[in-house]
């Protein structure tokens, strides 16, 4: 059965993406960083072991944007909070396990994605915890219907996001991948640059 990896992306417009990072380095530079980081990410995770999709926002501009690779299929994120949009993605994808990631996780590698899909062989859902209490990946096996209440009441952008999300899955079995760090602030960016200088290639 085909595996599906979905990367959620926003158009890299200054003042609309990475605004917390922009407070430290300027909105234009933050948008530039996001654009180039996501393009590198897409090159890394475009892998024959799964089908790569782009979930884009804003819906209309994202579907026609020339910023992202034109050979990758796109779907609009639609309205609502992050939970609404991810729930819609899980319900709309073709048959097969689905993993969703964002574009702001510079440490993620194909080995991390492969590990997540393998965990879905033994679990109904999988999460990749982030260092801030959220998560960089969520995946679902989807052998049964996606719960209607998935992601309802989650306190997004807080240290409770992961725990709240797991709670919405009820009795479904959950596995956890390695913890990774996203880049939301100047401090996060500095920490990533330090890791890059000293970390071995994976």
Question: Where in the sequence are the language-model features?
Answer:
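Short beta-strand/loop segment that forms part of the nucleotide-sugar
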Residues: 50-58
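A short, N-terminal amphipathic alpha-helix
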Residues: 32-50
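Short, glycine-/small-residue-rich phosphate/pyrophosphate-handling segment
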Residues: 143-166
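Conserved donor-nucleotide/metal-binding helix-loop-beta segment in metal-dependent transferases, i.e.
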Residues: 108-135
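Short phosphate-binding loop-to-helix
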Residues: 64-97, 158, 168
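Short aromatic-hydrophobic micro-motifs that form the base-stacking/packing surface
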Residues: 99-101
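Conserved alpha/beta core of the MobA/IspD/sugar-nucleotide pyrophosphorylase nucleotidyltransferase superfamily
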Residues: 160-202
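N-terminal nucleotide-binding beta1-loop-alpha1 segment
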Residues: 1-20
